[in-house]
């Protein structure tokens, strides 16, 4: 994993704020897309890379009969998520410390797995996909949401966007993120047996 080095650059509080904003900005469109893919209330859901719990909280609020497990490799973010969502009963919400590569979660446990902006940090995306496949119940669904810097689609970026991209590129290089993972996801999924 290459995630923690972002703290050296922007600090934990700024990273939590960034993740909170990221979760809220795309929520309405993402939630519609997740429902279109088959997400339904009452499902058992795994949120891989649950971070500070921002997205997990949105899932809990919009799926009141679902049981959600947040899996997070970063102890700082996991602690923030647990504190933030401590009022939810354990029948609805569980958090697990660990990587998707060795989660310790029971195979065939989840109806729906959501993996948002995690693959760009993975050194072994094929192994992660293999583990996700094992964790899904038969007929289960995985939704991988990630980025690809080649798909931004801004025809004439303004000066602020250009300067922001320079800063983001610095973070990407230092953290060794794979910001072109989006174009590889379909091949990875097919290779690991997803239809």
Give residue spans per PLM region.
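A short glycine-rich, Lys/Arg-flanked "PGG" loop and its adjoining helix->strand segment in the class I
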Residues: 126-141
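Class I SAM-dependent methyltransferase SAM/SAH-binding core
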Residues: 46, 52-102
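Conserved alpha-helix/loop element of class I SAM-dependent methyltransferases that forms part
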Residues: 24-41, 58
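A short acidic, Gly/Pro-enriched loop at the edge of an enzyme's catalytic core
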Residues: 101-112
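Conserved catalytic/acceptor-binding region of the Class I
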Residues: 143-195
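A short SAM/SAH-binding and catalytic strip from SAM-dependent methyltransferases
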Residues: 111-125
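Class I SAM-dependent methyltransferase Rossmann-like catalytic core
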Residues: 3-27
């Amino acid at each position: 994993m290459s995630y923690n080095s972002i703290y050296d650059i922007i600090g934990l509080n700024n990273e939590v704020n960034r993740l909170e904003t990221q979760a809220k900005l795309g929520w309405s469109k993402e939630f519609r897309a997740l429902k279109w893919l088959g997400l339904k209330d009452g499902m058992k859901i795994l949120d891989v890379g649950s971070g500070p719990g921002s997205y997990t909280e949105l899932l809990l609020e919009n799926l009141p009969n679902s049981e959600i497990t947040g899996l997070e490799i970063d102890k700082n973010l996991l602690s923030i998520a647990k504190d933030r969502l401590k009022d939810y009963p354990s029948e609805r919400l569980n958090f697990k410390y660990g990587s998707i590569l060795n989660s310790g979660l029971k195979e065939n446990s989840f109806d729906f797995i959501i993996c948002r902006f995690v693959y760009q940090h993975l050194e072994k995306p094929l192994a992660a996909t293999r583990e996700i496949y094992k964790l899904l119940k038969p007929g289960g669904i995985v939704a991988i949401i990630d980025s690809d810097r080649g798909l931004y689609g801004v025809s004439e970026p303004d000066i602020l966007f250009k300067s922001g991209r320079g800063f983001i590129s610095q973070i990407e290089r230092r953290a060794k993120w794979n910001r072109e993972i989006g174009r590889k996801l379909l091949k990875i999924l097919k290779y690991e047996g997803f239809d």
